[in-house]
A protein has these predicted regions:
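Bacterial N-terminal signal peptides that target proteins for export
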Residues: 2-14
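Low-complexity, acidic/polar, glycine-enriched regions of mature
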Residues: 26-229
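Bacterial N-terminal signal peptides
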Residues: 11-24
Length: 229
């Protein structure tokens, strides 16, 4: 004879297990758990306006100088690092605009990063700081924005067009360049590139061996800059 009490007890136990294992399991990723420390910040988590100080130690700002002339194949292109610069960026979140950017570079902080001998490095840097930039006479290179426009491309990410006055070697000219801007909770990162002609700023490109080896007039700048609130 079947023990009804035992049978019903086992049946209830089986039903309880079935209910437990049928419940949905909580998935932290499904709830939007943060899986990246540097995930772009949502606009709702940022203040209305932001003021950021540029961090040169966490940034990269370089110049490429290219060789030209009949014997350019015997020369080398040079990569120059801008090491000492300060600045401030101001943005209005969601729309970006109005916004502003100011950057001050120490002229004597430009350094050659190519693999060359110490003596060659010194010669190149002495020429660059002395004959080209005249760093003693013009110790700072200054950029001040006049207009900044931007369009949103994703959460916390924008494509910006920045125009402003660049003062280099005692000459001020207007320049315009594109930059990507990504906002994080306590910082921003901007990346881009632009070109300049040395002659526009009263600089005569370096030339040796009767002009058979010389530096091209056009220089290419690229930047990856981090700024913190």
């Amino acid at each position: 004879m079947i023990n009804r009490k035992g049978f019903y007890r086992r049946l209830l136990y089986a039903l309880a297990l079935l209910i437990v294992f049928s419940l949905p399991v909580s998935d932290p990723l499904a709830k939007g758990a943060r899986v990246e420390a540097d995930k772009p910040a949502a606009a709702s988590r940022l203040p209305a306006e932001g003021r950021y100080k540029i961090s040169a130690g966490h940034s990269r700002f370089i110049v490429r100088a290219f060789a030209s002339g009949l014997l350019s194949a015997l020369a080398h292109d040079h990569t120059i690092s801008i090491r000492d610069f300060t600045g401030e960026a101001r943005f209005t979140y969601v729309t970006i605009e109005p916004a502003s950017l100011q950057l001050i570079i120490k002229s004597d902080s430009l350094a050659v990063t190519d693999k060359v001998s110490d003596s060659d490095r010194k010669k190149i840097e002495d020429t660059m700081r002395g004959e080209v930039l005249e760093a003693d006479k013009y110790p700072e290179i200054i950029f001040k924005s006049t207009t900044v426009t931007a369009s949103r491309i994703d959460e916390g990410k924008y494509q910006a067009k920045i125009s402003g006055d660049l003062t280099l070697h005692g000459t001020t000219r207007n320049v315009t360049f594109d930059a990507s801007v990504t906002f994080y909770e306590a910082s921003l990162r901007t990346q881009g590139q632009f070109t300049l002609k040395q002659s526009d700023y009263g600089i005569k490109p370096v030339s040796v061996a009767g002009g058979t080896i010389k530096v091209k007039n056009e220089l290419k700048f690229s930047f990856d800059i981090v700024a913190n609130r």
